[in-house]
């Protein structure tokens, strides 16, 4: 899920004179692996009968608690001004949409397909930001969007989709749109604050919605055994770790390199789904997956313009 956040205004930059950039690279790659592990573990729990609402409620509750503890331990601010606090909590709605859409899609389509569709979120952000922030749509980015959607058509296959597959595709697309909404709304309403504090509030807002849907839904805590609960907690820890590792690495190598490296997330997810869930990609679908990832990388390339990433877009973010 997870592909949630970004810095929403506070200037982030690579630490000057950083002599060990490989540590930053390793942290961002570990972050990508954390996000990937979280969705794969949650998908395993879904296949064992755990409901989507149950899974998201537990995962994001654990992630929120872990992020809160890390913020306090690091002496970083937790509180926000009233205006920014309400805006960040409001972003929890988009967190909720992303969680329901992304994880819900794995009930109907393979995880490897869901992550590719979900990862088209930056493309939606690209076109929306043209009107909200006058972000230029360059030829490179238009070509990248075309490549990504061409690859997506290959990855989904040329055959007609079943009703359940259509539900999965639409669910993943809703998650991608939720991600784009998070990025766009956050960059317009929240500025000059610690991005991790924004993440904390938005995750908390999303968690509250997940819990409400869990307790007022038709089948609360369905399929939640002790083993499944441990798995979901592990998934939540992976999310929390991923956020902490990402921003630690970003400070060392800057947002441009961090955004590029985070594009390894779908690669990790597809690989993990193959080994853990037994998912397989045909030759044509493998090419399609490669094209999607290539398109997203091109969108985030420095020469294409300001990085448009699912987790790192923000005004004021720059690299020294």
List the predicted regions and their residue ranges.
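Hydrophobic transmembrane alpha-helices of multi-pass small-molecule transport proteins
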Residues: 2-7, 67, 120, 137-157, ...
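Glycine-/small-residue-enriched transmembrane alpha-helix faces in small-molecule transporters
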Residues: 1-54, 58, 93, 101, ...
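Specific alpha-helical transmembrane segments that line the substrate/conduction pathway
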Residues: 54-65, 95, 102-136, 175, ...
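Helix-helix packing/entry segments at the starts of transmembrane helices
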Residues: 57-58, 114-120, 185-208, 239-275
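Hydrophobic alpha-helical transmembrane segments of multi-pass integral membrane proteins
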Residues: 22-30, 53-69, 85-86, 140-150, ...
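Membrane-interface helix-cap regions at the ends of transmembrane helices
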Residues: 15-16, 63-81, 149-163, 205-228, ...
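Specific transmembrane alpha-helical segments of multi-pass solute transporters/efflux pumps
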Residues: 34-39, 68-114, 118, 154, ...
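Hydrophobic/aromatic residues within transmembrane alpha-helices
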Residues: 45, 55, 59, 105, ...
């Amino acid at each position: 899920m997870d592909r949630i956040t970004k810095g929403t205004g506070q200037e982030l930059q690579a630490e000057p004179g950083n002599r060990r950039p490989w540590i930053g690279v390793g942290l961002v790659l570990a972050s990508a692996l954390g996000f990937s592990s979280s969705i794969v573990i949650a998908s395993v729990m879904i296949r064992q009968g755990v409901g989507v609402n149950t899974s998201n409620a537990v995962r994001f509750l654990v992630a929120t608690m872990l992020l809160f503890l890390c913020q306090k331990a690091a002496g970083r601010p937790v509180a926000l001004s009233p205006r920014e606090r309400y805006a960040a909590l409001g972003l929890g709605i988009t967190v909720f949409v992303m969680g329901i859409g992304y994880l819900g899609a794995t009930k109907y389509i393979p995880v490897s397909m869901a992550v590719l569709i979900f990862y088209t979120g930056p493309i939606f952000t690209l076109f929306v930001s043209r009107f909200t922030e006058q972000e230029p749509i360059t030829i490179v980015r238009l070509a990248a969007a075309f490549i990504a959607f061409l690859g997506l058509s290959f990855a989904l296959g040329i055959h007609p989709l079943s009703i359940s597959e259509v539900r999965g595709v639409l669910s993943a697309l809703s998650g991608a749109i939720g991600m784009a909404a998070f990025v766009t709304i956050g960059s317009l309403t929240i500025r000059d604050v610690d991005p991790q504090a924004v993440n904390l509030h938005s995750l908390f807002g999303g968690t509250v919605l997940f819990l409400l849907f869990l307790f007022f839904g038709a089948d609360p805590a369905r399929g939640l055994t002790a083993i499944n609960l441990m798995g979901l907690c592990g998934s939540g820890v992976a999310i929390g770790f991923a956020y902490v590792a990402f921003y630690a690495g970003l400070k060392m190598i800057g947002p441009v390199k961090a955004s590029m490296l985070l594009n390894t997330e779908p690669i990790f997810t597809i690989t993990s789904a193959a080994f853990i869930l037994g998912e397989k990609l045909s030759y044509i679908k493998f090419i399609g997956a490669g094209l999607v990832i290539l398109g997203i990388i091109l969108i985030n390339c420095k020469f294409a313009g300001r990085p448009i990433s699912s987790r790192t877009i923000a005004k004021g973010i720059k690299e020294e």
